[in-house]
Amino acid sequence: MGAIVCINGCNANVLIPLHYKHMVIPPLTFSAKNLDTTKPGILDVRDVLDDPMAKENLATVIPIERASCRLLFVVSEDDRNWNSAYYAEQACNRLKEHGRTNYEVVSYPKAGHFLEVPYMPHHPSGIHPAVGKEVAFGGEPIVHADAQVDAWRRVQEFFRKHLQGLSGPLKSSL
């Protein structure tokens, strides 16, 4: 058994086609009409991606139900990069629909997109490489810092629990 941690991820492929063995997962499209601007001119891109669960976008959804390993979804509820909580919920729904129970979710209200190792600086906004402009990443500094400490502890515990005793590389099941 293996383990994967997904921190503020999307349940669909984004930006460019994803090639894996015989599969090609197309990228999820976006709607610039959902772009918002915050004070002082920072872009809010949270709702720019189209809904991966809409019928026309289902081909973009990653077939997570094929993963045989344990999954931990770490979610920031104030993620302004994209709607991490919604994407984790949809990934878990897909797992449930396929009879899978190999996942856990931990959620942090008021934490922003970049949940990194403890004591890394909080970045409420920054230049987004895909957008080329300053975008909001969300989060309140103190709550975000506390979330980083807790998430780091949980990730380490998760890996210790589910990777203990494994030796050698694991074969992908996708």
Regions found by a protein language model. Give the residues of each.
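Catalytic histidine-centered segment of alpha/beta-hydrolase-like enzymes
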Residues: 111-146
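Glycine-rich, phosphate-binding/catalytic loops in enzymes
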Residues: 21-23, 89-92, 123-124
